[in-house]
Amino acid sequence: ANITQGGPNCSRPAALILGQYYQFIRLGFQGYKEVQYNSLTIAKYIHDEIGKMAPFVNYSDEVVNPLFIWYLKPEYARAAKWTLYDLQDKLSQHGWMVPAYTLPSKLEDYVVMRVVVRQGFSRDMADMLLGDIKNAITELEKLDYPTPTRMAQEKNLPVETKIFNHGCRTHKK
């Protein structure tokens, strides 16, 4: 076949990759490195601050990419009237997209939350997110009765979430 003309298909997934190439060319290696370093620095800051919060454990001790996950401490989760799904809902009321979901097969007992720090996410925004997490925890700890997601976990029933959940049941730890 004779192909005389070709053009890139800028569907959504390809657009992100092309955008990264453009940024790399525009900023140069050093500029792009600084952008990534800033994202990583903010991710490490949020990771460390979440690790200091009583209910949480970070899944890993180190942050090597501008993303990380955490989960409820098992001893905290046993007594809590809420789950990370409830925290996800509270944060979404303030405009944050911090998903809670189960890990894949053989780790599906863990419900985790994930933060991905994107380019342009500032230290001020990180402080706002951390403040909203702390406020949401304070509200959730005042509950008199368990939330529906907490009751579903207690009964080992599937939890309906707004985020992908690997189709697994959640188990209490």
Q: Over which residues does each language-model region extend?
A:
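Conserved core segment of the aminotransferase class I/II
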Residues: 1-7, 25
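Alpha-helix capping and helix-loop boundary segments enriched in small/acidic/polar residues
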Residues: 7-11, 37
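Substrate-binding rim/cap in mid-to-C-terminal beta-strand-loop elements of soluble/periplasmic
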Residues: 20-22
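Non-catalytic terminal extensions of PLP-dependent enzymes
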Residues: 28-173
